[in-house]
Design a protein with these regions (language model features):
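NTP/phosphate- and nucleic-acid-binding module
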Residues: 13-511
Length: 511
């Protein structure tokens, strides 16, 4: 069972996370385990926790901010630096309010909302039905929820669903109506329509309004793409499932401009390219699936979601859409500015480009990669159970790449370990830990996904053995691998290259 939170009628418990999944006795990955790990190890905290928490808002801690930035950096590398046809942009969060009129957000960007008339709790009608049907499959409405009319949603809810908040069996609900998801405010001291402004609900519109600037300043030729990572804001009716659905989130989007008639083939190419990204960074193919939209958005010709198998089931982590020429045509119409492209390679033909969009949620990627990496692994011997919690994160995503551990704090081992850490800092994100046994320190690093641990011991610093003979391991350290727990002696002088090579040749764990 996943608890739902209503900001108005359900105060946040002072010392609790909001959305804890039901605990299980086995060693599988559950949402409550991920939430617990995130807080305990500094990945994610509840925002404003000392004041009871802010609904749908989360802070990314010391490890979380590096993990999230690594995902973003790898996405950027994969989408722009490995390609010759994609450039970057960082557009403003605040855009002219007519931008959102042209895009259709003012008229169409809404979710179906329904209220319980007894406790006044509000719900997204479509999600209320989906959650109910997932636990009561025999009540399937017989058609996809996203194709149901408001009247059909209302009838199904009245006939089947007791209020999740107050538990009332009377099923007294309001009519289903649309709730616009944009946050709006006013810029400056005057609160009138001429100063109306919105927090952007998606990053892509800044790309469309800058289309002509990018073409002219960078001499871009179609086909080409523009990538962007940034924050977006949606006034969600319901927040649930930890960081999966929140009001403030980050998107990693790319808009690919192409000649009309070539869009279908390019659409399929981007579907394959984006699918391969998740496989490359460690998501098992069995945990991914495509979802084809039965009901398309007002701007779309075709749309697929990449869904990941979270502990809560398959949910979207990225959408790939054929937006046709809708956005550029709408901005031409609303602004009066010509957004056509002059194709010099096609006899100076003028046309409005079609757009293929890839839109990934950075926060949802964060959660998906965590869930995929999480394992409670039995490493016991002689028939005894001994479980370690380990995150099998790809080394390029892990918040810490290398931990340096002195065997003891004394006899110059700590100083040598710090010297080695300093040497590695230029190349890798490092950690230093000298508290507790080496075994316990390994476990701490496993739990946060550190792929490599270096142990500095007496063999490292002693040129000779106790009998006076040469020590062949002088100037070496023990390098321990997270996934296999195997250990290898490596020369200090070769550490940088050895670790770089290990990262370059890393193979995701298959489970």
């Amino acid at each position: 069972m996943v608890l739902q939170y209503n900001a108005r009628y359900n105060p946040v418990p002072a010392k609790e996370f909001l959305f804890m999944a039901e605990k299980k006795v086995d060693h599988s990955c559950t949402l409550d385990k991920i939430i617990s790990l995130c807080k305990r190890r500094g990945f994610v905290y509840q925002a404003s926790e000392i004041y009871g928490g802010q609904a749908g808002a989360w802070d990314y801690g010391p490890l979380g901010v590096d993990f999230k930035r690594n995902i973003q950096n790898e996405w950027w590398h994969y989408m722009t630096q490995l390609r010759d046809d994609v450039v970057g942009l960082d557009s403003a969060i605040f855009q002219h309010h007519k931008t959102w009129e042209a895009s259709g957000h003012v008229a169409h960007f809404s979710d179906p909302m329904i209220d319980c008339t007894e406790c006044k709790a509000r719900f997204r009608a479509d999600q209320l039905i989906e959650d109910f049907v997932s636990s009561h499959p025999e009540t399937n409405p017989g058609k996809p929820v996203d194709t149901m009319t408001h009247e059909e949603m209302k009838a199904f809810i009245d006939a089947n669903i007791n209020c999740p908040t107050c538990g009332s069996k009377n099923r007294k609900y309001t009519a289903v109506r649309e709730f616009n998801l944009m946050f709006k405010t006013y810029q400056g001291p005057v609160a009138d329509d001429s100063h109306l402004i919105y927090l952007r609900p998606e990053t892509c519109q800044g790309i469309f309004t800058d289309f002509k600037n990018i073409v002219q300043s960078n001499r871009m030729k179609i086909p080409f793409g523009v990538a962007q990572v940034g924050k977006s804001f949606r006034n969600e009716i319901i927040f649930k499932n930890f960081i999966f659905r929140t009001c403030e989130f980050e998107q990693m989007e790319m808009e690919y401009f192409c000649k009309p008639g070539t869009d279908d083939g390019i659409f399929e190419e981007w579907r394959k390219y984006r699918w391969a990204f998740y496989l490359k960074y460690g998501i098992a193919e069995k945990n991914l699936q495509w979802h084809h939209h039965d009901k398309l958005a007002h701007y779309a010709k075709d749309a697929y979601d990449i869904q990941y198998n979270f502990p809560i089931g398959f949910e979207e982590i990225e959408g790939i859409h054929n937006r046709t020429d809708f956005d550029l045509s709408q901005h031409t119409k609303t602004s009066g500015k010509d957004m056509n492209y002059i194709d010099q390679e096609d006899g100076n033909k003028s046309y409005t480009p079609y757009v293929i969009e890839t839109s990934a949620g950075l926060n949802r990627n964060f959660l998906a990669f965590l869930c995929e990496a999480y394992e409670e692994q039995n490493v016991g011997t002689d028939g005894k159970e001994d479980y370690r919690t380990v995150l099998h994160l790809h080394p390029r995503l892990a918040p810490i790449t290398v931990a340096v551990l002195p065997l003891m704090k004394k006899d110059g081992l700590a100083e040598k370990a710090q010297e080695i850490r300093t040497m590695l800092k230029e190349d890798f994100v490092t950690d230093y830990d000298q508290s507790g046994t080496v075994g316990k320190r390994y476990r701490r690093q496993d739990e946060v996904g550190t792929p490599y641990c270096i142990t500095v011991d007496y063999e490292t610093i002693h040129e000779t053995k106790e009998d006076g003979s040469p020590n062949p391991d002088f100037g070496t350290v023990t390098l321990r691998f997270r996934d296999s727990m195997k250990q290898e002696r490596v020369k200090i002088s070769e550490l940088r290259g050895f670790i770089h090579n290990a990262i370059a040749n890393y193979k995701p764990v298959v489970r």
